[in-house]
């Protein structure tokens, strides 16, 4: 989520207040001890908070507030994109932060002034035996996948080569949660518990690392033993699913409310 100028300024004001600084003393940030910076930002990162920091439209290098408009304009170099999400991204937060439901306070923390749109759609989820699965899907869609899909569609429309993926591997306690790709790409798995001990994870690691390495070197993801990875576009919506075995399927369109902006967090 790229923050608009107003949102970025609001978050900056929060940091300045925690740091005990005023606008006429902004230059003191340049000489602040790193310990003081960490102390000032700590309240902004406390608990389940995804948007305290991130890229911004600064009004200098990037004008306006519409990331998709910049992609449509194609003012920069035409580059290939490798994009994707994990199927159960927000299941990590269900377990780590005990996010088992949504209220106005949490919605505002995650989505800012977009919260009413999110709450309206959250209330449509049936509170039955399938609520956990549906809630994880809902939050994953609004926070992660919908933006990924919208960007992939826009970039492919603008002529960029787009390769889309989804990690479905769920043979572990938190399923295909946020950060679970680290065990395959970087041999790190600090958030992963009760992982399948069969040879399958090692095979998937070879597939994913091989495909990503090939993309870095040649601009096309591929690995020995994997199916051919077609480009994604709005009509031919092909997506590589990382599982055991890996396979290609059709990617669903965004499932968020049509009133939900691409920038999911704004103040």
Where do the PLM segments sit?
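Substrate-access "cap/lid" subdomains that shape
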Residues: 2-106, 133-157
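Active-site rim elements
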Residues: 2-3, 67-68, 129-142, 169, ...
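Alpha-helix N-cap/helix-start motif at coil-to-helix transitions, marked by capping-box chemistry
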Residues: 6, 109-116, 176, 180, ...
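Sec/Tat-exported extracytoplasmic proteins
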Residues: 19, 33, 122, 126, ...
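A general structural motif at alpha-helix termini
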Residues: 30-33, 41, 122, 186, ...
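C-terminal, loop-rich substrate-recognition/catalytic regions characterized by aromatic stacking residues
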Residues: 76-122, 203, 244-267
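Alpha/beta-hydrolase fold catalytic core
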Residues: 112-157, 163-165, 169
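Mobile gating loops/cap/lid regions near enzyme active sites that modulate substrate access
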Residues: 146-149, 153-267
């Amino acid at each position: 989520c790229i923050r608009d100028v107003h949102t970025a300024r609001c978050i900056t004001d929060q940091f300045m207040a925690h740091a005990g600084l005023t606008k006429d003393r902004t230059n003191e940030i340049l000489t602040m001890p790193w310990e003081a910076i960490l102390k000032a930002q700590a309240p902004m990162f406390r608990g389940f908070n995804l948007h305290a920091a991130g890229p911004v439209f600064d009004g200098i290098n990037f004008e306006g507030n519409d990331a998709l408009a910049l992609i449509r304009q194609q003012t920069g170099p035409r580059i290939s994109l490798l994009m994707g999400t994990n199927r159960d991204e927000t299941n990590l937060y269900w377990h780590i932060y005990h996010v088992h439901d949504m209220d106005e306070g949490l919605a505002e923390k995650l989505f800012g002034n977009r919260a009413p749109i999110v709450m309206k759609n959250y209330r449509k989820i049936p509170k039955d035996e399938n609520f956990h699965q549906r809630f994880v899907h809902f939050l994953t869609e609004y926070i992660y996948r919908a933006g990924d899909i919208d960007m992939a569609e826009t970039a492919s429309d603008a002529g960029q080569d787009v390769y889309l993926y989804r990690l479905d591997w769920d043979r572990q306690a938190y399923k295909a949660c946020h950060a679970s790709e680290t065990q395959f790409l970087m041999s790190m798995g600090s958030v992963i518990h009760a992982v399948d001990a069969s040879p399958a994870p090692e095979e998937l690691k070879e597939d994913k690392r091989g495909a990503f390495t090939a993309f870095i070197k040649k601009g096309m993801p591929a690995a020995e033993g994997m199916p051919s990875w077609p480009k994604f576009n709005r009509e031919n919506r092909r997506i590589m699913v990382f599982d055991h075995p890996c396979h290609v399927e059709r990617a669903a369109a965004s499932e968020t409310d049509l009133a939900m902006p691409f920038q999911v967090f704004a103040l």
